[in-house]
Amino acid sequence: MSTYAIIKTGGKQVKVEVGQAVYVEKLNVEAGQEVTFNEVVLVGGENTVVGTPLVAGATVVGTVEKQGKQKKVVTYKYKPKKGSHRKQGHRQPYTKVVINAINA
């Protein structure tokens, strides 16, 4: 059974494994640099360790592959019979991280 971990980043929890590429909320790190996630909620595998609320001393290390933006989401509001309408677009920024190691 391969080792996996659940980390907290960007207000979300993400399940990661070594070698996996994950998309997380934007991190202020340049492409090619290493990033360390200290908020590890669970480390699974042969012996599963569940944190209360975090696993003490556990870290997940990854390399930032790229920064980008998701596809545009368009919102449109209008009020009937009033001639009032509003169109707005939004592109959420993300960071693609390749997981290098899970240290438990």
Curated annotation (Swiss-Prot):
Tell me the domain of life: Bacteria
List the gene name: rplU
Recorded protein name is Large ribosomal subunit protein bL21
Q: Which GO terms describe its cellular component?
A: cytoplasm; ribonucleoprotein complex; ribosome
The subunit structure is: Part of the 50S ribosomal subunit. Contacts protein L20.
A GO biological process held by the record: translation
Q: What is the lineage of its organism?
A: Bacteria, Bacillati, Bacillota, Bacilli, Lactobacillales
Task: State the Gene Ontology terms under molecular function.
Answer: rRNA binding; structural constituent of ribosome
UniProt record similarity statement: Belongs to the bacterial ribosomal protein bL21 family.
Role according to the record:
This protein binds to 23S rRNA in the presence of protein L20.
Q: Enumerate the PANTHER family for this protein.
A: 50S RIBOSOMAL PROTEIN L21, LARGE RIBOSOMAL SUBUNIT PROTEIN BL21M
Q: Which SUPFAM superfamilies match?
A: L21p-like
Q: Which PROSITE patterns match?
A: RIBOSOMAL_L21 (PS01169)
The record's annotation in NCBIfam families points to: L21 (TIGR00061)
Q: Which InterPro entries match?
A: bL21-like, bL21-like_sf, Ribosomal_bL21, Ribosomal_bL21_CS
Q: Does the keyword Chloroplast apply?
A: no
Q: Keywords on this record?
A: Ribonucleoprotein, Ribosomal protein, RNA-binding, rRNA-binding
Which is a Pfam family this sequence falls into?
A: Ribosomal_L21p
